[in-house]
Structure formats: C-alpha cells, structure tokens
A protein has these predicted regions:
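N-terminal amphipathic/basic leader segments beginning at the initiator methionine
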Residues: 1-22
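Mg2+-dependent prenyl diphosphate-binding active-site environment of isoprenoid biosynthetic enzymes
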Residues: 22, 26-160
Length: 160
C-alpha cells in the first residue's frame, strides 16, 4: 500500500465532499455565503474529514452518501473555530495560510456572521445524512453521530 497515494485519494474525496455541501449564495444572503465559502476554501489539510472517512471504513463502513455530509460538517465546524479565533477580539490575525482572514477580507461583522453561519450550517449539512438512511438502524446511527457532533464545539468540547 502506497501511503501517500492513499492519503491523497482520501484528501481529494474530502475536498469533493466539502465543496459539494458548501452553501449556495442566494440573493438575500449572498454576502454571508460568499464569506463562508471563502473561509472553507482557504486551504487546509482536511485532516478531520479524512479521519472521519478512515474511521468509518475501519469500523464497519458506511455508505459514502451518509458519511459525506458529516465530513463536510466537521470541516465547517473546524473552519468556524478558525474564523472566530482570527477575529480582532481573539488573536487579531489578518492572514491564514497566506490569504487574508475572513474578517480582514470582509470586515469584522461579516467575519462573526460567517463563523456563526458555518457552525449552524454544519448541523444542517450533517442532518442531510438522514436522506440516505435505509432503515431504523441507520436513523439511530445518524442521530447518535449528530448528537456527538453537536456536543463537541460547545462548552463540553472546544470551548471547555
């Protein structure tokens, strides 16, 4: 097994899943969706969605269409944390990975809203896995995964 080749395949699959679930800018909220997408597409290793896919494969598998919404969601949650961490009230970073941070590109208020939007949209995205549930067991597994995902960005996880 060629580790580099396999890892690149996982990263490409993660990139595709993330891109597939990005919010589509609509007239009323186009500026927020644009800032959200800018943030998510700013680069990165995509380690979290790759690890999620690998774990799903190792521990019994899961249909691709059921795991992909969670892969995108976990990357959105990670990105939300970076967007908020870069804000002037936190680290005041103006560049990340050689690009302007979200608040530096769009302004502080839009940076806050983009981060908030990513966190909320992550749950909406993960819930799309229910569309692919084949039976009650799938529904239970998705509900448990969603509960676990929702518990980690808050006070019992990233904030605690």
């Amino acid at each position: 097994m060629d580790f580099t080749k396999t890892m690149n395949e996982y990263v490409q699959a993660a990139e595709a899943a993330v891109a597939r679930y990005l919010p589509v800018p609509e007239k009323r909220t186009a500026f927020i969706a644009e800032a959200m997408n800018y943030s998510v597409l700013a680069g990165g290793k995509r380690l979290r969605p790759v690890l999620m896919r690998v774990c799903a494969d190792v521990f019994g598998g899961c249909p691709e269409e059921m795991i992909e919404p969670f892969m995108a969601a976990i990357e959105m949650i990670h990105t939300y944390s970076l967007v908020h961490d870069d804000l002037p009230a936190m680290d005041n970073d103006q560049y990340r990975r050689g690009k302007k941070t979200t608040w530096a590109q769009y302004g502080e208020a839009i940076g806050i809203l983009a981060g908030d939007g990513l966190l909320n949209y992550a749950y909406e995205t993960a819930a799309k896995a229910f569309d692919y549930a084949a039976d009650a067991d799938d529904m239970k597994r998705i509900a448990e995964a969603l509960r676990l995902l929702a518990s980690k960005p808050g006070i019992g996880g990233m904030l605690g």
